[in-house]
Amino acid sequence: YMSTKYNLRESTKSSYLYTYDHYVRDTFGKKRIADIKYSDVLQFYYYLLNEVKIALGTLDTVHCLLHPTFQLAVRDEIIRNNPTDGVMKEISRESSKNRGIRHALTVEQQRAFMEYIANHPIYYHWWPMFTVLLGTGCRIGEALGLRWQDLDYDKRTININHSLSYYQKPESNKSVLRISKPKTEAGIRTIPMLDIVK
């Protein structure tokens, strides 16, 4: 499947290869594709969640790799149906019953966290970064990728149009930093610069 994807970003390709090597290759990857059924995929996904203890988001990455792989096998007439169809929907439905609702930090929790960082002998130098993250809602890669030209102090705005990512190059032991544009147009945005961020 990966050899047919010429338009994948290097970081996405690296993430898929890492995911395959760490969660699929030595387990599910040893099965013959024609022998795999829906129930096998469901069991494998539950194994990853309950035994390996991966997060639901990581499982989604596994699925984003396996689903199109099986879909390609359907198109190539190796198998008739994609055994991954509907599995994530079932997993998500079951998972949402057992998972609590995520809550953002309260203002008091944010204040306590920032005070802790500011007064900590080791972490105090991270205070400006956490101030930007909390004050903008940026993702970590977006905040790390900010340049002076992205900041407009007169209009009090921050232009988010790229992010910094760190990933291992496929088939190499070298890791690289790379500036890249957001995957979608919605990722390009202008946000207000709060007083504390300024």
Residues of each region from the PLM?
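N-terminal core-binding DNA-recognition domain of tyrosine site-specific recombinases/integrases
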Residues: 2-76, 83, 121-122
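C-terminal catalytic core of Y-nucleophile DNA break-rejoin enzymes
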Residues: 11, 157-159, 168-169, 179-198
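Short glycine/proline-rich turn/loop motifs
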Residues: 26, 93-97, 178-184
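Secondary-structure transition/turn motif
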Residues: 46-50, 159-165
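Basic, Lys/Arg- and aromatic-enriched nucleic-acid-binding interface segment
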Residues: 56, 60-64, 75, 79-81, ...
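Phosphate-binding active sites in nucleotide-utilizing proteins
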Residues: 150
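Compact Cys/His-rich, Zn2+-coordinating modules
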Residues: 164-176
